[in-house]
A protein has these predicted regions:
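Noncatalytic alpha-helical scaffold of FAD-dependent oxidoreductases
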Residues: 1-298
Length: 298
């Protein structure tokens, strides 16, 4: 299929404002957050920005008929090159699909579109007393769809797990253009765990157009402890001792001397620059349990 004819078919699906093929418009989409020296420059032939699952399915069917490769993309914050069009073709960018469709407080889930920003979801559910636990370092800009594609984690995965632990069901457009729904709110869905197969598949098995995500209740109390050590080995032993004592922090991060100096130079956070290492230990839960765990660590 000629490029002009392909563009016209795509515009008929998503509108002229949702299709880009001019080289200057494609510059943004030939990169993601991965290292250019490793990933290289990978420019798609055309970028499509759908607003509905039906539009995604229609675009995939057009690509299949034309024999054109498809690359799904969220915010492009990934570091592994998964959002790059390595073989050109059509890039389907899902950042216009940003609706939170349902918040179910009784069953503790939300149904969202893939373009919803990770942190925005937690800010939306916070007034209801819940948050979305996976918290990648790019959570201010990364999308739920991207989190699902990469099975993203974050500092709080120590206690709460990674994205796969918080996805109950998915609406997915398959490479054939067929739309399916996997999983659901039931604790044990019958049949093969297709949801588990799809999470982390980086868009190779299908394109997520809706997600039923597990919501976690906001903790009653949170306490963050900062501990300085003369050397990194001592900090490492402290980590082992905390876990061995039966304390499960919500997050547990270590900074070496070089990182401490870099953070202080940039943010003046107040960390001791003469320390060999610093531990940041976040404890959350019921107030009494947080106080008890904090005392044990100290």
């Amino acid at each position: 299929m000629r490029a002009t004819a392909l563009r016209e078919r795509l515009e008929a699906v998503v509108g002229r404002d949702g299709v880009f093929s001019d080289p200057s418009d494609l510059l943004l989409y030939q990169y993601d957050a991965s290292d250019e020296a490793i990933a290289g420059i990978n420019r798609p032939d055309v970028v499509v920005l759908p607003r509905t699952a039906e539009q995604v399915a229609a675009v995939v069917r057009i690509a299949r008929e034309a024999g054109v490769p498809v690359t799904p993309r969220g915010a492009g914050t990934g570091l592994a090159g998964g959002a790059l069009a390595a073989r050109g073709g059509i890039m389907i960018v899902l950042t216009r699909m940003t609706r939170v469709l349902e918040i179910n407080q009784d069953d503790r889930y939300a149904i969202v579109e893939p373009g919803v920003i990770n942190l925005d979801l937690s800010q939306t559910t916070n007034p209801h007393g819940y948050f979305f636990a996976p918290d990648p370092s790019s959570q201010r800009s990364c999308t739920i769809g991207g989190n699902i594609a990469n099975n993203s984690g974050g500092p709080h995965c120590l206690k709460y797990g990674v994205t796969s632990n918080h996805i109950l069901g998915l609406e997915v457009v398959l490479p054939s253009g067929e739309m399916i729904w996997t999983g659901g709110a039931a604790p044990e869905s019958p049949g093969i765990d297709l949801t588990g197969v799809l999470v982390g598949s980086e868009g190779t098995l299908g394109i997520v157009t809706k997600a039923m995500v597990r919501l976690t209740r906001n903790p009653e109390a949170v306490n963050v402890l900062v501990a300085a050590f003369p050397e990194i080995e001592a900090a490492s032993h402290a980590v082992s001792a905390i876990i061995a004592a039966g304390v499960l922090p919500a997050a547990l991060e270590m900074m070496d001397a070089l990182t401490i100096r870099a953070v202080e130079a940039a943010y003046h956070a107040g960390y001791p620059e003469d320390a060999g290492a610093v531990l940041l230990v976040e404890i959350d839960g019921l107030a009494e349990a947080v106080a008890e765990s904090s005392d044990m660590i100290v």
